[in-house]
Amino acid sequence: MEPIIKVKDVQYCTLQCPDLDIQEQFLIHFGMHTVEKTDEMLLMKGDGTQPFLEKIIKGEKKFISNAFVASSMDDLEKISQADSFGDIEELSTPGGGYVSKGKDLDGFGVEVVFGIQELEKESAETIPTNEGRKVNRMNQMKRFLKGSYPRILRFAHCGLNAVDPQASFDWYQNLSLIHI
């Protein structure tokens, strides 16, 4: 079966959490940075070009959705016509763009987005490494600052919890949200 659309990547996840302050501190220690915070919503980003990686809404603790990037506006329009997806809406989050929201077979949110503007790439200080017989760093210690956190560059994968794994696999593959 030919997939309905072509998906390029994953973009962000949306979670619901009762305490945004605790979640913000956890994600900062995890290696993310605060983009925007209100009493009801928190947006966090990494060091890469995605405007945000995680959207947290205040409320009872639960998973809301994963967002996938359509290959084109035409693909976003196609997916918006699929049974479990809605009309295209303009995103009000950093980077703008458009979204069609739907639900998978287990009732979890699935967002398909297009047109989100990436940020300019930030340059990161790289520490040379020695590889095999190639010596790029001689007599120099490679030290990390005390308390330094990991660098999160991008939202690159997501997990799924399914009642019927094969049916969910087929559903996501039909939308080209997973590839084998």
What residue ranges belong to the model's regions?
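N-terminal beta-strand motif that seeds the catalytic metal site of vicinal oxygen chelate
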Residues: 1-21, 65-66, 124-166
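Short, structured motif recognition centered on aromatic/hydrophobic residues
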Residues: 10-13, 32, 44, 63-67, ...
